[in-house]
Amino acid sequence: MAHKVTSANEPNPLTGKRLSSCPLTRSGVTEVAQIAGRTPKMEDFVPWTVDNLKSQFEAVGLLMAHSYLPANAEEGIAYPPLVHTYESLSPASTCRVCDLLDTLVNHSDAPVAFFEDYALLCYYCLNAPRAWISSLITGMDFLHILIKYFPMAGGLDSLFMPSRILAIDIQLHFYICRCFLPVSSSDMIRNANLGYYKLEFLKSILTGQSPANFCFKSMWPRTTPTFLTLPGPRTCKDSQDVPGDVGRGLYTALCCHLPTRNRVQHPFLRAEKGGLSPEITTKADYCGLLLGTWQGTDLLGGPGHHAIGLNAEYSGDELAELALAITRPEAGDHSQGPCLLAPMFGLRHKNASRTICPLCESLGAHPDAKDTLDRFKSLILDSFGNNIKILDRIVFLIKTQNTLLDVPCPRLRAWLQMCTPQDFHKHLFCDPLCAINHSITNPSVLFGQIYPPSFQAFKAALAAGQNLEQGVCDSLITLVYIFKSTQVARVGKTILVDVTKELDVVLRIHGLDLVQSYQTSQVYV
């Protein structure tokens, strides 16, 4: 059921003026900026800051409480968070976050600084992994902005409720549909088609039922191939490796060679000083929040895993203690935790892997996680001269060399040591969503300190629609969602083969070298 939104042709009940049909376009930002003029200087908003989350911890508890699946599956049809999530995934529904922004912007004199801070949050989302931790942090940062610029708006203290805004709406707006991205009119129909596929297969992930009457081979758009359109450096051998069904229309202008893509210059001190320099301090990490939230769940517990416990590395950690103090809903499935915040909407298990990847979570939770995993991957590839299986290499390195003990941060080290060899194998070599998360995550953006002289100009450029570039092309991520649905929903063998064959080609085009997707679909979730 689609929820009601105010039409652009209806007069605003507060001002009598007609609402803008797209309040956050580049032209809309410019128009509002001219009207609003200059506003008194406020304290700079910096996303991905622990203090933002601490200041809204009641809202954290509210959002988490409504992010549990029902403990009794038979009650799911009437379980408010699940009903809300299902409705938001309907192609006939509108984006609830866009609706809220439209109402706030058009019913008040929004200052220019609001658009700058909102655009800055969107920029951070483009450099963050699609993960549970990202959805939670983004939701709290978004609420922080709303309270800062619209203090007179009623109900913001209870924003995260069914029929208002829940985890799925944060994910759809900031990570799945990315409603904030500039788009040309020529791309609208193509984006609408891909958007429909995303929603249908995300719904499939939620319900465990594949879309009816879907034939991938005939419905997924593919045209005449040409290796000349493929981005990134390629050799003659590379071109021969690409099968003949790569679509020119899908993988050209918006395509990205992820390992070599150029990143926008940003005003973050850590990056300008040369990366992980020890004298440059970074923002606090969120590892304590992960530990406190997932203690007592099945995320890292069970066969082959070390049960989560607040060990010495986390004693006295404020975020861990705050997370432990959050009341869990009686009707919720505590074993899966607040899993509706995660991209896969649940916590499923297969061969010591989980649908919530603990390594993807570490990317969004700690500034050193990506470099640590990169070093570990290099060690896996280079430490053995004979043909030892990748998984065996991981097991040997963890058992015999205590590889993870050289991680400087004790909290990150403790989190990684709770992961199984299969977690590392899946994340570093197998799963396409993990590979995309790892490639696009930029720790210098998420955790770097701000360099004030260029910060304001950078925010102004973002508010004008500049530098908001899709980190990964829409066709690739849509195909990955289709693939992920085949791991948890029952599909025919023909569809599975068609999807994995296409995905292998597209991953190679984008510079992501993984094991065959069919193998991943059979071994992990």
Curated annotation (Swiss-Prot):
Residues 1-12 have a biased composition (Polar residues). This is Packaging protein UL32 homolog. GO terms for cellular component: host cell cytoplasm; host cell nucleus; viral envelope. Pfam families: Herpes_env (PF01673). Zn(2+) 3 binds at C255, C256, C473, H510. It is found in: Host cytoplasm; Host nucleus. GO terms for molecular function: zinc ion binding. The keyword Zinc applies. It comes from Epstein-Barr virus (strain B95-8). Plays a role in efficient localization of neo-synthesized capsids to nuclear replication compartments, thereby controlling cleavage and packaging of virus genomic DNA. Zn(2+) 2 binds at C357, C360, H427, C434. Its main location: host cell. It comes from the Viruses. InterPro entries: Herpes_env (IPR002597). Belongs to the herpesviridae UL32 protein family.
